[in-house]
Design a protein with these regions (language model features):
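Short, intrinsically disordered or compositionally biased N-terminal tails of bacterial proteins
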Residues: 1-12
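Short, contiguous hydrophobic alpha-helices characteristic of membrane insertion segments
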Residues: 11, 67, 118-119
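N-terminal helix-turn-helix DNA-binding core of bacterial DNA-binding proteins
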Residues: 12-56
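Alpha-helical DNA-recognition elements
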Residues: 61
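Exposed loop/turn and edge beta-strand positions of beta-sandwich/beta-sheet ligand-binding modules
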Residues: 83
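Amphipathic alpha-helical dimerization/coiled-coil segments
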Residues: 92-119
Length: 119
C-alpha cells in the first residue's frame, strides 16, 4: 500500500501544489521558460495572482531537488547587458509530476462525491 510517507520517499521529495504549477507551466511553455513567462502562464491558467519572488524561490528549490536545470542566456540590451536565466524540466521533474498526478487521481477516485457536499 502506498502511503504519503512512502510516496515522498519514492520521489525523493514530494511536490507541493505551487511546485506542481511551476513545473506544469515550464512544460506548457516549451522552451521559453524563465521567470516572467512562468508567472504569466500560471496566472492565465489558474486565474490566481502570482508573485515573481515566489516563482524564483520555487525554481531554486526545484533545481536543488534535481527537477529542473537552468542556464543563463545571451546578454540583452533591455536587461542592461544581463542574460535571462532559462529553466527546463528534467526527467526527474517529469517523473515527479506523473507520480503526483497518479497519487491525486487515486485519492480522488476513491472519494465518494457526496462527502464533498455542503451539510
Amino acid at each position: 500500500m502506498l502511503t504519503l510517507y512512502s510516496f515522498r520517499a519514492m520521489t525523493h521529495q514530494g511536490l507541493g501544489e505551487f511546485e506542481q504549477l511551476v513545473l506544469l507551466a515550464i512544460v506548457h511553455l516549451r522552451g521559453e521558460s524563465y521567470g516572467i513567462p512562468i508567472v504569466e502562464e500560471i496566472e492565465r491558467r489558474t486565474g490566481r495572482q502570482v508573485a515573481r519572488a515566489a516563482v524564483y524561490v520555487t525554481l531554486r528549490r526545484l533545481e536543488e531537488k534535481g527537477y529542473v536545470s537552468s542556464w543563463i542566456g545571451d546578454p540583452t540590451p533591455e536587461r542592461g547587458g544581463k542574460g535571462r536565466r532559462y529553466v527546463e524540466i528534467e526527467s526527474a521533474g517529469r517523473r515527479a509530476l506523473r507520480e503526483s498526478r497518479q497519487l491525486a487521481d487515486r485519492m480522488w477516485g476513491e472519494l465518494d462525491p457526496a462527502s464533498l457536499r455542503s451539510r
